[in-house]
Swiss-Prot record:
Domain Ig-like C2-type: from-to ranges: 42-102, 137-202, 237-300
Protein's job: Receptor on natural killer (NK) cells and T cells for MHC class I molecules. Upon binding of peptide-free HLA-F open conformer, negatively regulates NK and T cell effector functions. Acts as a receptor on astrocytes for HLA-F. Through interaction with HLA-F, may protect motor neurons from astrocyte-induced toxicity.
Chief place of localization: membrane
Cell location: Cell membrane
Protein name in UniProt: Killer cell immunoglobulin-like receptor 3DL2
Extracellular topological domain residue ranges: 22-340
Residue ranges that the UniProt entry lists as topological domain Cytoplasmic: 361-455
Protein keywords: Cell membrane, Disulfide bond, Glycoprotein, Immunoglobulin domain, Membrane, Receptor, Repeat, Signal, Transmembrane, Transmembrane helix
Intrachain disulfide bonds: 49-95, 144-195, 244-293
Record's bilayer topology term: Single-pass type I membrane protein
């Protein structure tokens, strides 16, 4: 009797061991994806089927019963790399491991694994409220929104293999959005976030990712010190350098300025006094501002130290004492554009006046030259015509004085000049055996009959 009971108990144990996985027991494999379940279109993903008792062979299948040729009748070992992925690869997957000692030869189905393919719609926008720089223990709201009427929004942190958070989109004023609450913040929640959207009937075919948003947690390490060289008060145009230093061996220093969304970062350099320092050159000073610096380690780039004490940099000799904040209205930018227009208009007017002055000067010069030519005696012009008609190899050069300017003339011998005396009041002097030459002599005002100048 006891032997029969023992035999039946053994049979029941083996039957239960084979049936337990099929009944949803703990003896089922675990399916995971590396590097992430969120895969960009055209990318690759590695699917791994794990089993606590260990096996090397497994098979994959898709729950929506769509035909995937690469899975049909195939047995995989350790892992399977799927890609380049297309929208058809999006969906829910499971795996079964090979179990030689089970009744069916295969384990129970694994956990469902959702593979989401991105890049199928226009990207949404991601904002942080109250901001991306927060203290440990605070709560931040990440708002994902788009003018595309997405049914669901997904929030994913880079570097983790967990499924992204999912919320139903709310539509207001032609915009769909979802608010993801994260907190209380801890170092494990710091990192780079992106969000996606999906439309109805294609829940796992996601949009392109939003621009990355870094959520930084501060206040976990000792604060550094911030100083200015040559000092916090400088003249306009003077070079300024801000130095951030600490006894802690920070790898990176971050410099932020009030009113600016972006920070500057530099690698820390060990100094002789055993401090770690980074020097931020700001260049010629034009405007003042309030600065702070933080320290961080390379292993946790989004976990920063406490803020340094604020440092106010003042610039003297400059009418502006601060930069316009990016959150202020763009009226100041409009003033700059208006100033450029005024400067350009002034330059055009100046060039136009200069051109008019030049044309007027040319016109006056031409008019004066024409008046001088009109004042030349008729006899002198007649002599010139005769001179052109009769060419005598023996020529005499004369110089005519007219208003203290001697003008070169070439005429015939005196015997060939007209007999009628000329009324020209010009005075001539004969220069025999000399090369034709004209000489201009400046002289003071004198009677027209006088002759001044030396030949």
């Amino acid at each position: 009797m006891s032997l029969t009971v023992v035999s039946m108990a053994c049979v029941g144990f083996f039957l239960l061991q084979g049936a337990w996985p099929l009944m949803g027991g703990q003896d089922k494999p675990f399916l995971s994806a590396r590097p992430s379940t969120v895969v960009p279109r055209g990318g690759h993903v590695a699917l791994q089927c794990h089993y606590r008792r260990g096996f090397n062979n497994f098979m994959l299948y898709k729950e929506d019963r769509s035909h995937v040729p690469i899975f049909h009748g195939r047995i995989f070992q350790e892992s399977f790399i799927m890609g380049p992925v297309t929208p058809a690869h999006a969906g829910t997957y499971r795996c079964r491991g090979s179990r030689p000692h089970s009744l069916t030869g295969w384990s129970a189905p694994s956990n469902p694994l959702v593979i989401m393919v991105t890049g199928n719609h226009r990207k949404p926008s991601l904002l942080a409220h109250p901001g991306p720089l927060l203290k440990s223990g605070e709560t931040v709201i990440l708002q994902c929104w788009s003018d595309v009427m997405f049914e669901h929004f997904f929030l994913h942190r880079e570097g983790i293999s967990e499924d992204p958070s999912r919320l139903v989109g709310q539509i207001h004023d032609g915009v769909s959005k979802a608010n993801f609450s994260i907190g209380p913040l801890m170092p494990v929640l710091a990192g780079t976030y992106r969000c996606y959207g999906s439309v109805p009937h294609s829940p796992y075919q996601l949009s392109a990712p939003s621009d990355p948003l870094d959520i930084v947690i501060t206040g976990l390490y000792e604060k550094p010190s911030l100083s200015a060289q040559p000092g916090p008060t400088v003249q306009a145009g003077e070079n300024v350098t801000l130095s951030c230093s600490s006894w802690s061996s920070y790898d990176i220093y971050h410099l932020s300025r009030e009113g600016e969304a972006h920070e500057r970062r530099l690698r820390a350099v060990p100094k002789v006094n055993r401090t770690f320092q980074a020097d931020f050159p700001l260049g010629p000073a034009t405007h003042g501002g309030t600065y702070r610096c933080f320290g961080s380690f390379r292993a946790l780039p989004c976990v920063w130290s406490n803020s340094s004490d604020p440092l106010l940099v003042s610039v003297t000799g400059n009418p502006s004492s601060s930069w316009p904040s990016p959150t202020e209205p763009s009226s100041k930018s409009g003033i700059c554009r208006h100033l450029h227009v005024l400067i350009g208009t002034s330059v055009v007017i100046f060039l136009f006046i200069l051109l008019l002055f030049f044309l007027l000067y040319r016109w006056c010069s031409n008019k004066k030259n024409a008046a001088v030519m009109d004042q030349e005696p008729a006899g002198d012009r007649t002599v010139n015509r005769q001179d052109s008609d009769e060419q005598d190899p023996q020529e005499v050069t004369y110089a005519q004085l007219d208003h203290c300017v001697f003008i070169q003339r070439k005429i015939s011998r005196p015997s060939q000049r007209p007999k009628t005396p000329l009324t020209d009041t010009s005075v001539y002097t004969e220069l025999p055996n000399a090369e034709p030459r004209s000489k201009v002599v400046s002289c003071p005002r004198a009677p027209q009959s006088g002759l001044e100048g030396v030949f």
